[in-house]
Amino acid sequence: SGVALITKHTEAARRFSIAMQRRRTEKIYQTLVHGWPSEDTFTINAPLLRRGEVEHSPIWLKRMVHKDGQSAVTRTRVLERIQHSGEQYSFLEVTPVTGRTHQIRVHLSHIGHPIVGDKIYQDETCYLRFIEDGWTSELEKQLLFPRQALHASKLTFHFEEGDLSWAAPFPEGLKLSC
C-alpha cells in the first residue's frame, strides 16, 4: 500500500524515469514487524539472491541473503515498540538504499523480525496454504492480517529546481491496538 507515481504526460514520465535511473529518489516505508529490535536505528547490509538459484524453493520468486547475491542495504529506525495480546511488535521506518526485489521483507526476516502478515518471509508454508485454500481462520491467527504490513509512506524526487514529495499515512487496517 502507499504512494505510487503515475504520470499523464510523456515528458513527465521521462523526467521521473531519468531521476530514478540516476538514483535521485528516496522511498521511505513504514512497517509493522514481529519482535523488538535491540537497536533503535540500524543498517542491514546483506546481499540478496533468488533462493532457487542455490537450493530448492517451492516459491520461485523467494529471495534470500547469500554471499553471492547482489548488494543490498536497508536503513531502519524504530518508531514505536508495541505490546499486543502478550506479543512484542515494532513499528519501523525503513529506507532501502538499494532497490532489490523483496529487499525490505528479506532483510527484516533475516534479522529475526519478519513483517506482520508476510506469507512468504514469515513462514513460507503460509503462502503455500493460502494458494491452496485461500484466506482461512488459521492463517489469520498466524499472520494477523491478510496482507503484509508494509506501506510506502513517502516518495521524494530530487530535481535541480527542487524536491517533489508525496506522502500517505499508514493504513488504519494494518495498525495494532495496544
Show the residue positions of the predicted features:
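RNA pseudouridine synthases
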Residues: 1-178
